[in-house]
From Swiss-Prot:
Keyword field contains Kinase: yes
Binding annotation for ATP: 21-29
Keywords: ATP-binding, Cytoplasm, Kinase, Nucleotide-binding, Transferase
Localization of this protein: Cytoplasm
Chief place of localization: cytoplasm
EC number: 2.7.4.25
Species this protein is from: Rickettsia felis (strain ATCC VR-1525 / URRWXCal2)
Family the UniProt entry places it in: Belongs to the cytidylate kinase family. Type 1 subfamily.
Protein name, entry field: Cytidylate kinase
Length: 219
């Protein structure tokens, strides 16, 4: 872990950033820009849940069959070329993420990835509180649900996908409720996280704020 008291911070050394927040808050775009700026490996923790959701669909496993979902979570394989970003998969991923045993199994994969990667920014819901509590920098991104729904709508439209704004908003509100109320690692910022509301900010403006924070606090 980086010594926060050092006066000459060297970005060539080991460095871990946790980037948490609700769905469609802008984490992905911000994380990718930060990863490029500071030469970090970028990883979305949601991919492991989306992969499991895809596997459930592919193997015709009902998400209410908890034992079957738990068993499948022990055999995770991320090596595929399928599109995991559609809203149906995201909704199922949110449902299975509330299963404690599933989170425990997938968290082992994520924790090991953080420990074995020297320079990484990991994005998710509980990275700063569960996966990487010793991260050098913890950031929590949030935004108004309506703004987030509009962002997701534009993203999907840009990919040529058919979508309905009201339905996206409904799903975001539902996922927020599920994420915040789940017993296993509910969505909340770490006590020492930098919290940024991106409702009125562009991704570049958020990156600038984080960069200034790093320069002021970590150097």
């Amino acid at each position: 872990m980086v010594d926060l008291k050092t006066k000459a911070f060297d970005f060539s050394q080991n460095f871990t950033i946790s980037l948490d927040g609700p769905a469609a808050s802008g984490k992905g775009t911000i994380g990718l820009i930060l990863a490029k700026k500071f030469s970090l490996k970028y990883f979305q923790s949601s991919i492991v849940y989306r992969q499991l959701a895809f596997d459930c669909i592919n193997q015709k496993i009902d998400v209410t069959d908890i034992d079957a979902v738990i068993a499948l979570s022990k055999e995770l394989n991320l090596d595929n070329n399928f599109d995991l970003e559609n809203e149906d998969i995201g909704n199922i991923a949110s449902q299975i993420a509330v299963i404690s045993e599933v989170r425990n199994n997938l968290n082992k994969y994520l924790i090991n990835l953080v420990k074995t990667t020297l320079r990484i920014i990991m994005e998710g819901r509980d990275i700063g509180t569960v996966i990487a509590p010793d991260a050098d920098l913890k950031v929590f991104i949030t935004a108004n649900p309506q703004i987030r729904a509009e962002r997701r709508y534009k993203q999907l439209q840009a990919k040529g996908k058919t979508c309905i704004l009201d339905e996206i908003l409904r799903q975001i509100i539902l996922r927020d409720k599920r994420d915040k109320e789940r017993k296993a690692a509910p969505l909340l910022p770490a006590s020492d996280a930098l919290i940024i509301d991106t409702s009125e900010l562009s991704a570049i403006e958020v990156v600038e704020e984080i960069t200034n924070y790093i320069k002021n606090k970590l150097t």
